[in-house]
């Protein structure tokens, strides 16, 4: 129909003396069906988009629900990661048990750090005691060698300098060993400190879910961890990020 109207209009324009006016009328006439078709197509397109949006809205269910206020609701609760998604009572119960164990494990890491610090201090104390003992005995050993009337003077002069009492190596070796032990201990303590910082911030993220069940699980884990790993340590430690 649109093509037929266009042909009729062209023929009329060629035969009409009022070419300008007739051409305008033909353009308007032939454009009406095309515009209508465009409107129909646009309406269909928008309708399709609305349908797509409708389907998208239907697929929005099951995503993580991030709470910024205290709540007891566990619907679509995600803990730290989107993969850690609470989907029902069983997953909630298992997650709370895991949180209790994780929080108790933090106290275990702190206990391991305290024990290593004590052992490191004991090792360094042994080095200090040994070095002091050698330093006290060195003058007496030197005087004993010099006052020995049976010592062969020629043998004494032929002893290598590295083996003479005045230039013996126990003190130097002790200092070198102490330095190595200190450096190794410092690296291990730094690693343990980094683990504690990471662990404590992870627990902070657990608490920042603002979910009452998760908060209670963190508190129960801290309670259990102190009972198991406390070792009569002071319970007055202030809670901080690390």
UniProtKB/Swiss-Prot annotation:
It is found in: Membrane. Keywords: Copper, Copper transport, Ion transport, Membrane, Transmembrane, Transmembrane helix, Transport. The keyword Nuclease does not apply. The chain crosses the membrane at residues 8-28, 86-106, 187-207, 210-230. It is a multi-pass membrane protein. Coiled coil: none annotated. This is Copper transport protein B. It comes from Aspergillus fumigatus (strain ATCC MYA-4609 / CBS 101355 / FGSC A1100 / Af293). The gene is ctrB.
């Amino acid at each position: 129909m649109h093509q037929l109207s266009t042909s009729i209009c062209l023929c009329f324009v060629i035969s009409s003396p009022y070419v300008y006016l007739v051409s305008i009328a033909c353009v308007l006439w032939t454009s009406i069906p095309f515009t209508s078709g465009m409107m129909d197509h646009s309406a269909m397109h928008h309708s399709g988009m609305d349908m797509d949006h409708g389907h998208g809205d239907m697929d929005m269910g099951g995503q993580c629900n991030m709470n910024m206020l205290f709540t007891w609701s566990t619907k679509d609760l995600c803990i730290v990661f989107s993969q850690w998604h609470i989907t029902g009572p069983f997953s909630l119960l298992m997650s709370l048990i895991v949180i209790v164990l994780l929080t108790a494990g933090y106290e275990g890491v702190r206990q391991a750090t305290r024990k290593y610090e004590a052992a490191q201090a004991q090792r360094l104390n042994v080095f200090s005691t040994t070095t002091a003992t050698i330093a006290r005995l060195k003058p007496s050993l030197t005087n004993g060698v010099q006052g020995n009337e049976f010592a062969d003077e020629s043998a004494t002069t032929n002893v290598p300098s590295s083996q003479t009492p005045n230039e013996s190596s126990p003190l130097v070796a002790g200092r070198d060993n102490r330095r190595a032990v200190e450096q190794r201990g410092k690296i291990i303590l730094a690693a343990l400190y980094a683990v504690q910082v990471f662990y404590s911030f992870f627990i902070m993220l657990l608490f920042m879910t603002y979910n009452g069940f998760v908060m209670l699980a963190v508190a129960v884990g801290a309670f259990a961890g102190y009972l198991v790993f406390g070792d009569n340590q002071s319970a007055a430690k202030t809670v901080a990020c690390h």
